[in-house]
UniProtKB/Swiss-Prot annotation:
Its main location: membrane. Gene3D superfamilies: MFS general substrate transporter like domains. This is Uncharacterized MFS-type transporter MT3072. InterPro entries: MFS (IPR011701), MFS-Transporter (IPR052952), MFS_dom (IPR020846), MFS_trans_sf (IPR036259). Residues 417-445 are annotated as: Disordered. GO terms for cellular component: plasma membrane.
Length: 445
């Protein structure tokens, strides 16, 4: 690949390579959850213990995310993605080579430590190569890496695991090896001024004197819990709770993750259109909470809607990540975005690591509906934390235009400004606007 990829096609090609590399890291991080049925059936491993094993890559991520972010700000995306993928592959091969669950957990933890840089590097890469009016769409496409990685794991790992845990772990090992090669050949760092030429203001910490980033971190961490819980327990819920086969459950998990991938692209484009990353995040949080509460209400009641609600929450739960990553890179700037994304991913992974063992124990003692209800509290708590007034640099005019359109539409609705309908008088001195035609006012899009 050319080392000066200024063309549109070259930028998108780099983004696609970044997507594949990041998908491989999420395959490793989340793929262990698809070994749970094998661990339960072949080894008699309790669900709480299997959930703890599935969380080990996330615990490894927590340890190194900020360090990877610091390294990213200083050496660039290509180096971080290549080295991280290679080390993750080595850990996956090591985990596949041992029989003891203790040693498998150790190597999964080490692999999680190695995988921490890929997600931050991929987000920073997109922010560097794409202008503001395309960044939401590009970040949304790049963020399909997580559901695509999980979908590939759901489709392949359960079938391989029928031959043993070793066979299931070999799949992420091979994929991460290919990702390391792709990083070396296909990733090009975006052009940036050197740190020595940057102004003092550009190098200043974006956390100083502002709570914006901390609010984004807190909201995204809370929104991580529904994602973690559904990814970890959807497969085993379908098998044990509904009597599905491993193959049937794996296919449905794959379909839900593919729908989530398409949803991430759609909400990224939506954020470009409305000129805001955070307004969609608040709506996603509210929708996630409502869906989980509905699932808690109908589960165990013999309803035919519980599987549909599970698909819905598994899609909704993955929609927000790209929007938050785009907002962080835009607000933090090129010299702090690596560390800011490192902190962001650390807070998310703390939730991702804590979720499987805690909710595994809760499901064992109190059944699934209680777990869904408790999980719904997390996105509900995120709603007031989302900084909806934060506007992306370069899209302020578009955001204001959308706000004016919404304001005018709501004024019309509140004043019953419909054709042939009663109208409330406006403020003194305000000219009365005459509408013609018989079509009702439609809300702005």
């Amino acid at each position: 690949m050319s080392r000066d990829p200024t063309g549109v096609g070259a930028r998108w090609a780099i983004m696609i390579v970044s997507l594949g590399v990041t998908a491989s890291s999420f395959l490793f991080i989340n793929g262990v959850a698809f070994l749970i049925p094998r661990l339960e059936n072949a080894r008699g491993t309790p669900l709480s213990h299997a959930g703890l094993l599935a969380s080990m890559p996330s615990w490894g991520l927590v340890v190194t995310m900020f360090a990877w972010g610091y390294l990213l700000d200083h050496v660039g995306e290509r180096m971080v993605m290549a080295v991280g993928s290679a080390l993750t592959a080595a850990a996956a091969y090591a985990a596949a080579s041992v029989h003891s669950l203790l040693w498998i957990g150790v190597f999964l933890f080490l692999g999680g430590m190695a995988a921490g840089g890929c997600n931050s590097a991929g987000g920073r890469l997109v922010s560097g190569w794409f202008p503001p009016q395309q960044r939401g769409l590009a970040m949304g496409i790049r963020q399909t890496a997580q559901p695509l990685g999980i979908a590939s794991g759901a489709l392949v790992i359960p079938e391989l695991a029928e031959r043993g845990v070793h066979a299931g772990l070999m799949f992420p090992a091979v994929v991460c090896t290919l990702a390391a090669v792709a990083s070396v050949l296909g990733i090009v760092d975006p052009p940036r001024k050197s740190r020595t030429k940057a102004s003092e203001q550009e190098l200043a910490s974006p956390y100083r004197g502002s709570s914006i980033l901390w609010r984004i971190h807190a909201a995204s961490a809370l929104l991580m819990m529904p994602q973690t819980v559904t990814v970890t327990f959807m497969l085993v819920w379908l098998i044990n709770h509904h009597g599905w086969s491993v193959a049937q459950a794996g296919v449905l998990v794959t379909i839900s993750q593919l729908l989530g991938a398409l949803g991430r692209v759609a909400v990224g484009r939506w954020s470009d259109h409305v000129g805001s990353r955070m307004r969609p995040v608040r709506l996603i949080a509210a929708a996630a909470a409502a869906t989980l509460f509905l699932l808690a209400a109908v589960d165990n009641e013999g309803s035919r809607y519980d599987v549909l609600l599970m698909i819905a929450i598994s899609v909704i739960a993955v929609l927000d990540n790209g929007l938050e990553a785009a907002a962080i890179t835009e607000y933090a700037g090129p010299y702090w975005s690596g560390r800011a994304l490192g902190i962001q991913n650390t807070t998310q992974r703390l939730m991702a690591a804590a979720g499987p063992p805690l909710f595994g124990s809760l499901i064992t003692t109190a059944a699934y509906p209680t777990a869904w209800a408790l999980c719904g509290v997390f996105p509900l708590a995120a709603v007031p934390l989302v900084p909806v007034r934060l506007l992306p640099p370069g899209l302020e005019t578009r955001a204001r235009r959308q706000s004016v359109r919404r304001h005018r539409w709501w004024q019309a609705v509140r004043c019953h400004a419909w054709p042939n309908g009663p109208r409330r008088p406006g403020p003194p001195g305000q000219p009365r606007r005459v509408r013609q035609g018989g079509t009702a006012i439609t809300p702005p899009t």
